[in-house]
């Protein structure tokens, strides 16, 4: 039976039992900020189970896309090494919201497994919670499972109700026993039944978990029975498919076999049993569906988990000999397998492939070099020793290797990793950042040697450079040892030192067994470049000769942003006027941030014009030209000198497109190298100073793609083409206003009706005055005021007090006194008297007052006390 057929039969079976088929929710949980990803079928129904949300149905069934990677639920490190761990899986489930309970849930499960899927009954074992006699009796007496195949599991995790067979959503809230169904693969496979010492073997495999939510647990641990118990079940599609297709490993089912074959095709591997192919087949599913749900590779949160999964897949491709982008080419194969069940995948397949290819290209630039670093480090690790934390950190920080990826590689080689050392290196970096760069304290170091010859305009790699000075913690030294932070001065360098708003370069200084990771480059004196970083290996001495290599990827992104800044500056002057002058800038690999003199926010039209002008220059693909000349000649030739910058007699003039500025920074060779220019923000930073931020190249492309994906999602939600969204949003807003008006009218009518009922049934007479005090359920304060006004007019002379308790425990109070009684009784006093009894306060005019409280339990007595309070004042 194919996986698609198994999924379809499951949903159709429960549909025939009165269940509504509910589509899979997003992998990004909509109602649970504590979850990184949707990891089970019940996540989208959590608020239904807790009573916060009502649905039009009481029975539901779904096939839920799920991810367990990152956060509390993380299977990433096990994928590729076990038969059943996945980052992405499908959870088949059926749910009852206060409708049926244990008997039906158990009978449905048994019927589906034995009659629809035709599994041999004698192959099925079940577990129940030790104290759940009800479930035990249903299995034994009604279903007919022999007692020897029903196992009671008690509290086996060290606390009351801490059991494999007792489920709870959190420390408090809905919870209850569960019953798990296991499939026996037979005696030829090692392992014992659940609860036995050999239960971790592979003979008995759990295929379905039936959770019976029948208790509410309070903070003290007390259990109260729920008035309407619920059912939540989950069965992994991949696991049941393995059973029905008579294979032992999930990776042998039809769905995975086709993806594994596709991975073999793209990597050129003939051995389909290779574990790396399993990893790639698993990871393409997780990565593709995460992108479908709007997640993009990044360095934080869900985006970083996606990046880790992609890079793990690429590393396994590299291990198989594939050094070129290949992962994105598996998307069509995935669509062929899962596009029918999940049409959202087919709809954005091109976008998914684009995002994956960009990530492949980004990581591919550093993967090979990083692997060489790792291979070299592993070759030096003595037997039984771990890989040092410094190397772990270098691979993470410089080469983009997630630490779990490096640990994965080490595990294959039988080497542990020094996580404590890695965390220590991370902490050092955090401390350096908090101090605005520990290394930057070295600016102004005493140095009496020759200036550094800068070769970085033409080359990113320079051999034979000589160490002319070394500094550790501000003190000049002759030698630096491995693990020390230091500043290295060279006689020549390709590293650009931070200047003119452009950040300094990063990279490596190497020679033999010496490796110095450059984290920043600054001028410690005019013309003297300090390479700030950490000696990761070897010993470094003054006079040593090194190979200096700049991080080319980072430099390329930085120069794109720097060159775009020049074009943007010129464009701003054209659009806003010649008064625009630079007031500050920051150019780094991620963006350009440009502060300029202007006294008003830019309009959307002005920003669009700036973008159009800059991108026109980019498309013109003009060559960049730099000349060195006298300062006076440069200014006479039209070169723009920047505010606040100091220039010598001789300056460097940069012509890029239509811009000419004095600039010593590094730049693209042609304007077309910028790729794409996009403004992402504009705002004020001081009086008369605006700040604009822009991105270029692959960052700009990714931003545009993200915005387009967001637009398409919005179009899907509003069921309108993207170009019609503004009109559709206006239409929805108008509909909302109309509905709000109708709701208000309905509330007014209901309030009037309720008021009539109260006037007839709840009014008492005290010394000739009509007194009405009542609690009327959940009514909003505005409607409550209207009711009090109506009752005053109808009953006068009268004193009226109405209270309404909301679902969130808040109490609204409104008191009213007719004008002829305000000399003796004040509405504000009345409301204050009642509010004080329910944990609140109130006040207002003599004839009308409002208040509130929070003690719902005290409300009935407080309302009942009004009659006596009025009597005492008449």
UniProtKB/Swiss-Prot annotation:
Which domain of life, per UniProt? Bacteria
Q: Which UniProt keywords apply?
A: Aminoacyl-tRNA synthetase, ATP-binding, Cytoplasm, Ligase, Metal-binding, Nucleotide-binding, Protein biosynthesis, RNA-binding, tRNA-binding, Zinc
Q: Which residues bind Zn(2+)?
A: 562, 566, 663, 667
- Classify the main location: cytoplasm
Details of cofactor binding: Binds 1 zinc ion per subunit.
Q: Which CDD domains match?
A: AlaRS_core
| Gene3D superfamilies per UniProt | 2.40.30.130, 3.10.310.40, 3.30.54.20, 6.10.250.550, Bira Bifunctional Protein, Domain 2 (3.30.930.10), Threonyl-trna Synthetase, Chain A, domain 2 (3.30.980.10)
Intracellular or extracellular location(s): Cytoplasm
GO molecular-function annotation terms?
A: alanine-tRNA ligase activity; aminoacyl-tRNA deacylase activity; ATP binding; tRNA binding; zinc ion binding
Q: What cellular component GO annotations does this protein have?
A: cytosol
Q: Which GO terms describe its biological process?
A: alanyl-tRNA aminoacylation; negative regulation of DNA-templated transcription
Q: Which reaction does it catalyse?
A: tRNA(Ala) + L-alanine + ATP = L-alanyl-tRNA(Ala) + AMP + diphosphate
Q: What is its EC number?
A: 6.1.1.7
Q: Which Pfam families does the UniProt entry name for this protein? A: DHHA1 (PF02272), tRNA-synt_2c (PF01411), tRNA_SAD (PF07973)
Top enzyme class: ligase
Q: Which cofactor does it need?
A: Zn(2+)
Under InterPro entries, the record lists: aa-tRNA-synth_II/BPL/LPL (IPR045864), Ala-tRNA-lgiase_IIc (IPR002318), Ala-tRNA-ligase_IIc_anticod-bd (IPR018162), Ala-tRNA-synth_IIc_core (IPR018165), Ala-tRNA-synth_IIc_N (IPR018164), Ala-tRNA_ligase (IPR050058), Ala_tRNA_ligase_euk/bac (IPR023033), DHHA1_dom (IPR003156)
What HAMAP family does the database record attribute to this sequence?
Ala_tRNA_synth_B (MF_00036_B)
Q: Which family does it belong to?
A: Belongs to the class-II aminoacyl-tRNA synthetase family.
Recorded domain comment: Consists of three domains; the N-terminal catalytic domain, the editing domain and the C-terminal C-Ala domain. The editing domain removes incorrectly charged amino acids, while the C-Ala domain, along with tRNA(Ala), serves as a bridge to cooperatively bring together the editing and aminoacylation centers thus stimulating deacylation of misacylated tRNAs.
- Role description: Catalyzes the attachment of alanine to tRNA(Ala) in a two-step reaction: alanine is first activated by ATP to form Ala-AMP and then transferred to the acceptor end of tRNA(Ala). Also edits incorrectly charged Ser-tRNA(Ala) and Gly-tRNA(Ala) via its editing domain.
Write the protein's name. Answer: Alanine--tRNA ligase
Source organism of the structure: Bordetella bronchiseptica (strain ATCC BAA-588 / NCTC 13252 / RB50) (Alcaligenes bronchisepticus)
> Its encoding gene is what?
alaS
